[in-house]
Amino acid sequence: MNRPERLQPGVKLRDADKVARIPVKIMPSERETMLRKPDWLRVKLPASNQRITEIKQALRSNGLHSVCEEASCPNLAECFNHGTATFMILGAICTRRCPFCDVAHGRPLKPDADEPVKLAKTIRDMKLKYVVITSVDRDDLRDGGAQHFADCIREIRALNPHIQIETLVPDFRGRIDVALDILSTNPPDVFNHNLETAPAHYRKARPGANYQWSLDLLKRFKERHPNIPTKSGLMMGLGETNEEIIQVLKDLRAHDVNMLTLGQYLQPSKFHLPVERYVSPQEFDELKVIAEDLGFSHAACGPLVRSSYHADLQAQGKEVK
């Protein structure tokens, strides 16, 4: 068996080059076998692109990244036009290679020590009141990137004292306690970590991750910060059943998670995992009722819902779908 070529620092691997490095073989999807996208997934583009252009220019001029662009989010136009963005720190190259995700895999560069200040200034200039900070996985760092998260939160609050900050963190594999110790110095207003799918589908969808580790991360943060909401998100369409998703919801509540996002998986390219089903808006509505009955303080459930989609409205308890 031929070994993959050694990764070069800063080189992005995408699509076929990325998924070739996972343990489950994925055959490229043929157009005739791909499920037809239903009408309810058609995204309406805004009348004006001015605000979108302004946000993209602000990101470029400061050398910053948004997960909206890097992960090819279908809501990019709506969110940018609304004046919101989810900032992705620690670079745009992930040490993991999840085949549902469009973020590039590779060997990341050293973290930018100036990024926390640049991020804080950009948020101030954009006059944002609620921000979501996420990152790629950084298994190459001894703390998984936790100190960089804490530094960003500190600098953002220094320049934006009235802002609310939500962090969407990786799983800090093997470093949970170290990471939580560091994050305790500057905790966010909402702590988010996505389980993504049911445990039976982790090997194909989240190679390198562990379902129980992710639950433990959410639980341990809540134990340290009982008054800070915890949140998690799931995708549907990766081969799971509704019954499996309901069990995940029960597991999340058993680990004291307060907020939920549930959305439709969309295949970024023919080289990624195929969509195995499109879940109807009615099914999402039914799952929302179940989530609320289980005790989630807020559940955003709908085909185009993503973990940071209208996160400010989610935090206010307003309906998002």
From Swiss-Prot:
Ranges where the Radical SAM core domain occurs: 80-297
SUPFAM superfamilies assigned to the protein according to its UniProt record, in alphabetical order: Radical SAM enzymes
Enzyme Commission no: 2.8.1.8
Extent of the signal sequence: none
GO terms under cellular component: cytoplasm
Residue numbers binding [4Fe-4S] cluster 2: C94, C98, C101
Positions contributing to [4Fe-4S] cluster 1 binding: C68, C73, C79, S308
Molecular function in Gene Ontology: 4 iron, 4 sulfur cluster binding; lipoate synthase activity; metal ion binding
Cell compartments where the protein resides: Cytoplasm
KW Cytoplasm (keyword) present: yes
Pathway: Protein modification; protein lipoylation via endogenous pathway; protein N(6)-(lipoyl)lysine from octanoyl-[acyl-carrier-protein]: step 2/2
Substrates-to-products reaction catalysed: [[Fe-S] cluster scaffold protein carrying a second [4Fe-4S](2+) cluster] + N(6)-octanoyl-L-lysyl-[protein] + 2 oxidized [2Fe-2S]-[ferredoxin] + 2 S-adenosyl-L-methionine + 4 H(+) = [[Fe-S] cluster scaffold protein] + N(6)-[(R)-dihydrolipoyl]-L-lysyl-[protein] + 4 Fe(3+) + 2 hydrogen sulfide + 2 5'-deoxyadenosine + 2 L-methionine + 2 reduced [2Fe-2S]-[ferredoxin]
Pfam families per UniProt: LIAS_N, Radical_SAM
Enzyme class: transferase
Cofactor binding comment, as recorded: Binds 2 [4Fe-4S] clusters per subunit. One cluster is coordinated with 3 cysteines and an exchangeable S-adenosyl-L-methionine.
Family listed: Belongs to the radical SAM superfamily. Lipoyl synthase family.
Name this protein carries in UniProt: Lipoyl synthase
Annotated organism of origin: Shewanella amazonensis (strain ATCC BAA-1098 / SB2B)
Name of the encoding gene: lipA
